[in-house]
């Protein structure tokens, strides 16, 4: 059963469309995508030509280097180890096509050369053209072998699922036993097996379409190389025709020369040509020696450059490590800078608080100075009052002495009164004991005479009077003691105030200093 894809149908209208409409819409989107031009910044023609030219030059240099170093056998062994996957069909096909299109490039046998025996060194243009074509073919083959190895391997050996045109529904779904069916919007019943087969066919078609797109991309990349190869073959054929014409003209000239000149003259000409040939060979040997020397120098320079490159890489790594260390130091310094900035803000806030406190302290100092002046005035007034109070204290001391004498007299009187009270209390206790004894007798007359009652009443009155006198005298003594205490504390207070003022003035002098 095909589930509706939420990514392909974001709107509510697509939910209501039929299966055929969905298929048509998807086919249209595929066609639109397929018709797009597959040109990007990495597939620009000028850039491709430049890269291919560079790769061609590099491949030719590498081949010469390998020939001189005798490293072709190692390269063949590596190619054998890589297996047949590295050998692409596109490259071999291209080389075979170009070889077929150039029939005269490799067949460089001319009748004039066989008859006259002239060596091929006299005509180097033909060899240069054929070697250039072969280099072009090798460069194209190498560039395409490097650029598209996985795609060519896919084309050579496709997967088994891509070979067939149909898939077996029984192998895909072995668990389905009952043929279930579904009803479409038109009312036609369709089996689930058919729907699954259709979905598999669609998947297979999409996969084949992707493979065809890849093949089209590869062919598009191979097309400019084939065009260039055809141009080079056409130019080679033109050069070959030109060379053939030159050879014919030279043969005609030689024939005319043979008819005009004698064999002795021809021998002289041949001797001169041999001398020229030997001189040319010597010059060629000298040039080859120079080239070999230049090659050795270039190899030495290359080795030096490689050594300098290795040293530069080591230095680069060292600089990288130093850069990373400096980066970490910079981060730590940044953190420290931020911490110091935060501390500076805190100190600025503290300084502002200290300034505000300083202003408050200055205001408080002015207030204290004002209070000091007021206290000085008060001290002067208090000193005058102290002199008066000293005279008053002397008077109070005299009064205190008098009051102490009176107090001693009163104390003696109180002691006498207390002794009298004790005696009276003892007498009363004895009388109570006697009364209790009289009550215990069998005959008791409760009536008392007036003479006995009166002394008891007089005693009670006397006791009350004595108590009142004691209370009055004690109250007077307490009042006098309080007055004496207040009189004693006044000079003490004066002394304390004077010491406080002296301490304040001393502290003020220290602050001013």
Curated annotation (Swiss-Prot):
Expressed in bone marrow, spleen and thymus. Not detected in heart, kidney and liver. Residues 266-488 form a coiled coil. The chain crosses the membrane at residues 486-506. Residues 507-513 are extracellular. Residues 1-96, 130-171, 381-402 are annotated as: Disordered. GO terms for biological process: antiviral innate immune response; cellular response to interferon-alpha; cellular response to interferon-beta; positive regulation of interferon-alpha production; positive regulation of interferon-beta production. Residues 17-31, 69-79 have a biased composition (Basic and acidic residues). GO terms for molecular function: zf-TRAF domain binding. It is found in: Cell membrane; Golgi apparatus membrane; Lysosome membrane; Mitochondrion outer membrane. Residues 1-485 are cytoplasmic. GO terms for cellular component: endoplasmic reticulum membrane; Golgi membrane; lysosomal membrane; mitochondrial membrane; mitochondrial outer membrane; plasma membrane. Keywords: Cell membrane, Coiled coil, Golgi apparatus, Lysosome, Membrane, Mitochondrion, Mitochondrion outer membrane, Transmembrane, Transmembrane helix. Disruption phenotype: Knockout mice have considerably lower frequencies of CD4(+) and CD8(+) single positive thymocytes, and concomitantly higher frequencies of double positive thymocytes. TRAF3IP3 deletion also affects regulatory T-cell transcriptional programs and stability. In addition, mice show a severely compromised potential to induce interferon production and are vulnerable to RNA virus infection. It is a single-pass type IV membrane protein. Its main location: membrane. Residues 386-397 have a biased composition (Polar residues). The keyword Kinase does not apply. InterPro entries: Cent_Immune-Sig_Mod. Adapter protein that plays essential roles in both innate and adaptive immunity. Plays a crucial role in the regulation of thymocyte development. Mechanistically, mediates TCR-stimulated activation through recruiting MAP2K1/MEK1 to the Golgi and, thereby, facilitating the interaction of MAP2K1/MEK1 with its activator BRAF. Interacts (via its coiled-coil domain) with TRAF3 (via isoleucine zipper). Interacts with MAP2K1. Interacts with PPP2CA; this interaction targets PPP2CA to the lysosomes. Interacts with MAVS. Interacts with TBK1. This is TRAF3-interacting JNK-activating modulator. It comes from Mus musculus.
């Amino acid at each position: 059963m095909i589930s509706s894809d939420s990514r392909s149908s974001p709107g509510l209208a697509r939910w209501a469309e039929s299966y055929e409409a969905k298929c048509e819409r998807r086919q249209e989107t595929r066609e639109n995508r397929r018709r797009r031009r597959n040109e990007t910044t990495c597939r620009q023609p000028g850039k491709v030509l430049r890269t291919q030219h560079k790769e061609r030059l590099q491949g030719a240099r590498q081949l010469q280097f390998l020939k001189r170093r005798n490293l072709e056998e190692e390269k063949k062994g590596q190619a054998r180890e890589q297996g047949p996957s590295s050998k692409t069909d596109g490259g071999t096909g291209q080389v075979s096509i170009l070889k077929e299109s150039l029939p005269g490039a490799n067949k460089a046998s001319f009748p004039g050369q066989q008859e006259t025996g002239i060596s091929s060194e006299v005509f180097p243009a033909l060899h240069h053209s054929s070697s250039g074509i072969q280099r072009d073919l090798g460069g194209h083959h190498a560039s395409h072998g490097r650029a598209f190895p996985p795609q060519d391997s896919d084309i050579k050996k496709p997967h088994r699922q891509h070979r067939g045109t149909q898939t077996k529904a029984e192998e895909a779904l072995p668990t389905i036993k009952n043929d279930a069916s579904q009803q479409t919007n038109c009312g036609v019943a369709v089996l689930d097996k058919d729907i699954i087969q259709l979905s598999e066919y669609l998947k297979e078609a999409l996969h084949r379409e992707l493979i065809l797109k890849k093949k089209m991309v590869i062919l598009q990349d191979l097309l400019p190389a084939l065009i260039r190869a055809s141009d080079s073959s056409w130019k080679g054929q033109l050069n070959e025709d030109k060379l053939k014409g030159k050879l014919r003209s030279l043969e005609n000239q030689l024939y005319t020369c043979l008819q005009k000149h004698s064999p002795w003259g021809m021998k002289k000409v041949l001797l001169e040509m041999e001398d020229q040939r030997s001189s040319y060979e010597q010059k060629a040997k000298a040039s080859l020696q120079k080239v070999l020397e230049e090659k050795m120098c270039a190899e030495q320079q290359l080795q030096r450059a490689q050594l300098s490159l290795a040293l530069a890489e080591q230095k680069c790594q060292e600089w990288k490590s130093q850069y990373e260390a400096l980066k970490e130091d910079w981060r730590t310094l940044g953190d420290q800078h931020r911490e110091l900035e935060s501390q500076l803000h805190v100190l600025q806030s503290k300084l502002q608080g200290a300034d505000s406190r300083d202003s408050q302290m200055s205001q408080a100092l002015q207030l204290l100075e004002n209070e000091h002046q007021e206290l000085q005035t008060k001290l002067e007034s208090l000193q005058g009052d102290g002199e008066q109070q000293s005279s008053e204290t002397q008077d109070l001391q005299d009064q205190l002495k008098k009051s102490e004498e009176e107090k001693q007299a009163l104390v003696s009187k109180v002691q006498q009164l207390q002794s009298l009270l004790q005696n009276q209390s003892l007498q009363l206790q004895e009388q109570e004991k006697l009364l209790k004894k009289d009550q215990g007798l069998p005959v008791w007359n409760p009536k008392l005479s007036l003479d006995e009652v009166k002394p008891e009443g007089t005693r009670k009155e006397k006791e009350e009077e004595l108590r009142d006198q004691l209370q009055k005298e004690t109250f007077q003594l307490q009042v006098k003691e309080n007055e004496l205490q207040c009189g004693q504390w006044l000079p003490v207070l004066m002394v304390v105030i004077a010491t406080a003022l002296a301490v304040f003035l001393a502290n003020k002098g220290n602050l001013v200093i």
